[in-house]
Amino acid sequence: MPVSKHMVVYPYFILLLILIAAAILRVVGIDFGLPMAYHNDEPVLVLACQQFFSGDFNPHNFLYPSLLMYFMHAVQRIYFVLAGGPVDLTMLYLLSRLTVAAFGIGCVIFVFLLGKKLAGSTAGLAAALLLSLSPLHVIHSHYATTDVPLSFFVLWSIYQALNLEERGRWCDYILTGLAAGLTVSIKIPGAAVFVPILIAHLIRIQRLEKMNLLRQCQEYYRRWPARSVLFLLPTFTATAAYLFFKHFAWFADRLLRRIPVDLWQTYHDEIVSHLAAAAGKYALLFGGGLLLIVFIWPIWRVRLGRLFTLFAAAVVAFFASTPYAIIDFKQFAHDFLFQMVVSQTTWSGTFADKAPALVTNFGYLLGDFGPVFLFFVVLAAARAIIQKDVPLFLFFSFGLFYYFYLGTWKLMFDRYMVPLLPILAVLAAIGFVWAAVELASFLCAKWRIPRWCTYGILTLLLFMPPAVGMGKEAVDFDRYLLKKNTRTLAFEWATANLPRQAKILREQYAPEIEIDGFDVINVNFMFNDSVDADYVYKNKIDYLIVTDKLWSRPMQEDGVVQPRSAYQRIVDYADLLWSIAPTPANPGPEIHIYRIRYPDPK
């Protein structure tokens, strides 16, 4: 049957409409809160971009790698060159958010391409529509943070891995390595993309060499039994890793002399306790990984040069886009350790009332996609395994590994699930399309019901209701951003009523009145027992600003979950001066402003 021009153009016209809807959902309200940053991770990136205008391109902060900062700065440079005028912090925030929104729209495009590659244009369009409406994806596309850009680079890496599995050219290995390296340079957990990449490499070799993977490996070791001694390596590695992390306190002092990072001293107990508790996990990770490498070594050694080239390209891409990880290694090591080790202990009280990470994270995904679409996700994954659909299995292998890896974390922010949303969108679309085709074929053969009738009914009954629900949640969030937040109202009151010469202490969710010239101490999550009357008297604090976003969270000290008693003691040394609670018209946190009550001099 000849393909008409209209049949080729039609899907791209629908995609254009979806992209317009995705852009509207991600741009409406994007200037919320400015000149304040309502998301506490935004200043990490935006203030680094501001510093770049001075000519110093060292971010001096490696809580995240640097690639996204440089992307944002490039956009900001272009804008200020064209628009002229001084560098304005408010505009830096807005441009940074727009950069992330653009990555969010790019994710929708990649989802269409991947869906089309795996199951045709209909699945690609359905996947693009689902991701464009995803509430969690829409929410985090408004923030100048790393999660949505990470999703974009994850999709690019998976797309390249599929090309590697399909064609296996040298350029495919190089491009895949570059994509993976840049993914890690957005956010370290992006290293999970190496799972589908390695699977793609193994499948490619097995197909080209016409190998039976299991039989080839068995034959390799049966022919030369002495090679079986290699299996002692994983056992030794797992044992050594377990003993090292379990007794890390013994190594800590020696490591401190070798790697003089002050974090070892400041958070010595937290690091030791975390690594000791995770000794079994690390032993399983190192031992299991090496066992897999040893067992399938007969496959690894084929075309090993191409695999090394891929990893070399990844390393070059990472350090080219995060160059100060080498130049300023001490700061990089400090922040990397803090992000991957210390933050897993000091913030764990925040999630003390949550279920384990695997359950909590599943709840985030269920709340975003709903049970119907998650059913189609499971259907597509099961079908891929049963029918040995290699490309589709390769595609969702990232999602499986990433989900279970983050299931070992104590931090359970919903934003950590953002890279899984495109994976779920594609799987849900493929599962729905497959179910619709199979059911339509059955009904057409048995009762001669027209296929278009079955497609229409299934779309109206099973696809549209949950999709409309997702879209409504996304629109509700945009409407939320358009309302005047309690932080903005508190900012306006404080800047109009507090003395300019006053010294103010605020916790991290309180309005950022320092941008209006006030002398402010920001104590972030450390607003715990260290903040008391002696602390405020010693630092000559005049006013205190706190919110229920932090005082309502428990904290964890020495493994014991307890309320933040520092907030309960505020009334012992301060008087409530002003407060505001959220309303439907003015959402946001409850905010209290206190005046410090100094004792009468004797």
What are these regions (language model features)?
Residues 25, 45, 64, 70-71, ...:
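Transmembrane-lumen/periplasm boundary regions of multi-pass, lipid-linked membrane glycan transferases
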Residues 140-141, 147-150, 183-188, 192-195, ...:
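Hydrophobic/aromatic-rich transmembrane helices and adjacent perimembrane loops
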